[in-house]
Amino acid sequence: MKKLLVFIGLVLLNFQIKAQVDAKAKKVLDEVSSKTKSYTSINAEFSITVENLKNKSTSTQLGKLTLKGNKYKLEVNNQVIISDSKTSWTILKDASEVQINNVEAKEKETGINPSNIFTMHEKGFKSEFVKEEKQKNGAVYQIIKLYPEDVKKKNFHTAVLTINKEKQQIVSIKILGKDGTDMIYQVKSFNANSAVPETVFVFNDKNYPGYEVIDLR
């Protein structure tokens, strides 16, 4: 009986600690969301590193993101994606091709895409506060893990956020894939509230003469 009571006590203690950790994670993430949504626009430069754990290969690409509400322009290597929140244009420079698609509401709300990359944690995830780490430059980083609530519908099982505590900004996101492939988004520069004209988020065929336009809507 004594051993049983000790076991129950440990279970309850672990539950209480877990609840406190989750509460701390929620507080940090709520602050990040509030700060991010206060910006009128975001201009960011970043890297995307793909790590294949099976064959131990790594590749990195550099990109730029302009974000304004649900509208965005993403540039990665020879590909540009423009979205006005209703329609998206994918420009494939190597193929001289433009693909037009509708932006699905479900993806806007719950998927990981450029329009919500800094607020992806708001819906569909359980969170866990892991630790704080002090960097050599004096900055304090907070590490939080996200677990999809419906893991069957995701191709990853965990997302690890690294947050600058003082700036309340996400500096990196690591997506741990079910297939053994991890993706790391690392923010290299972050500028907010600059003037961004609406024309940035609409495809202009004059900028891409001779490109084949394929409407997939």
Task: List where the protein language model places each region.
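N-terminal leader/targeting segments and the immediate start of mature chains
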Residues: L5, Q16-S57, N70, N207-R217
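Extracytoplasmic
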Residues: Y39-N43, T60-L62, G69, S83, ...
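A generic structural motif
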Residues: S47-L53, E75, I91, Y147-E149, ...
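An acidic-aromatic
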Residues: L62-G111, M183-I184
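Flexible, surface-exposed loop/linker segments and immediately adjacent secondary-structure boundaries
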Residues: V103-Y141
